[in-house]
Amino acid sequence: WGEKIFVTQPLEKEQERALLCIDRLDGKILWQRSVKYTEQERSHRTNPYCSESPATDGKRVIAVYGSAGVVCYDLKGKLLWKRDLGKIDFEWGAAASPVIHGDLVYIYRGPDPKAHLIALDKRTGKTIWQANDPAVSIDDRTDVFRRNKSREWIGSFSTPIIVTAKG
């Protein structure tokens, strides 16, 4: 945003998930904030922790850290709010980035047996609504899990997008 770049990074030795603010012109780290998370979390070797890209609206930056939660900082690194949204239990780990639109931040939490899309107030972190993924039978599936005997998972690995539907 402007001259700032925001990235997430796992600090595995420290057992932390970090958000870095980097100066776009010289590459210097302007600030770094991290969240401690010591519990074991499943993830794929090609999908390390902190795969989600942070999102900003120019006033705040929001980072999602899978099971380690969601954090919101102002652009100077002051913590505005933090939420624990529960654990994600999926063999490839979390990967969907948050999307800010209007006063809401949308976060997809899946694929997972409890997968859902959640909308939070970007100013407070309060849940505005949540839509749970429906259970799907194997015959209805079109994803790579078709051979999986689980009937509860829908495979979706992408970040939500905002579209206008029916008008």
PLM regions and their residue ranges:
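Noncatalytic, solvent-exposed loop/strand surfaces
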Residues: 1-167
